[in-house]
Amino acid sequence: MPSQPSSQDKAKILAEALPYIQRFHGKTIVIKYGGNAMTEENLKKCFAHDVALLKVVGMNPVIVHGGGPQINDMLKRVGKQGAFIQGMRVTDAETMDVVEMVLGLINKEIVNLINQHGGRAVGLTGKDGSFIRAKKMLVRDKERGQEWVDLGQVGEIEGIDPALIELLETRDFIPVIAPVGVGSRGESYNINADLVAGGLALVLNAEKLILLTNTPGVLNKDGSLLTGLTAQEVDELIADGTISGGMIPKISSALDAVKSGVKTCHIIDGRVEHGLLLEVLTDEGVGTLIKAN
C-alpha cells in the first residue's frame, strides 16, 4: 500500500499549483471527456472532482463528452452493428436515435456528478439554441481507393455561436455539451466529440484544449510516448501510419485549434486518477503537447 503524503508534501503540491491557478484564473479550458474515464466509477468521480475544483479556483472549464462504448453497447442490444470509416461512426436514422438517447443519459450523469462535487453544471446539446450548426460530412475511404463515402447523419461543423456558453460562464455554470449539431432543416447530426471540442476552443478563445484518451498520449511505432509534437511532425506521423484510426480526429482537432490561436492542446491519459489536475496545475503535466510550430 503506497504511503500517504506528509503535510509538507501536501504544502509543496499546493505551492506548485499556485502559479498555474494565477495564470489561468478567468481563462476558458475546453475538455473533451471520453474513454475509460467515462466508464470506471472511481475515474468518473475523480473527473467530476477535478472539474469542480478548477471552477472553484477561478477557471472556466467547458466539457464536451463522447459516448462511443456506451453507444456501441446499446446498438448491440438493439441488434445493430456499428461501423467506422476514418474514425467516424456511420450513422443511419435508427443509429442517430440511439446516439441521441445514449448521449442524453451520459450528459445528465456527468452533470449530476459534477453537481455532487460542488459544481454548478448544465447539460446541453448543440441543438439547444441551435448553437452548433452542422451539415452532412463526406469522407474519403482509403480502402475504396479514396472514394467519397456518405456516413449518413454524421455532421461537420458549419458554425458555433458562443453566446450561450459565454452566458453560462458569466453566471458561474459549467457547460456540459453532447456533440449533436443541428442542420438547416432541423435534422440532427452526430459530430465527433473531438472536433466539437476543438471548434468550441476556437470560438471561446480558450487558453487550453485538453483531450482525454485511453492511451498515455500520442505514441510512436515502438509504443513510446511522444511528449511534444508540431504540425509538421503530426503530418509525417499520419503519412507513415503511426497516427491512425480514432486518433486522427483528435490530432486534427488539436492542430486546427493551435493553428487558429488556442495556445496549447494536450492529449492526456484519462485512465490516470486526477490526470486533469496533473495537466493543468503541475510543472510536468502529462501526455502529449501539440504546438503549431
UniProtKB/Swiss-Prot annotation:
GO biological process terms on file: arginine biosynthetic process via ornithine; L-arginine biosynthetic process
Site location (Transition state stabilizer): K32, K250
Keyword Cytoplasm carried by entry: yes
Catalytic activity: N-acetyl-L-glutamate + ATP = N-acetyl-L-glutamyl 5-phosphate + ADP
Keywords noted in UniProt: Amino-acid biosynthesis, Arginine biosynthesis, ATP-binding, Cytoplasm, Kinase, Nucleotide-binding, Transferase
Entry's localization field: Cytoplasm
Family according to the record: Belongs to the acetylglutamate kinase family. ArgB subfamily.
HAMAP family the record matches: ArgB
Protein name: Acetylglutamate kinase
Species of origin: Nitrosospira multiformis (strain ATCC 25196 / NCIMB 11849 / C 71)
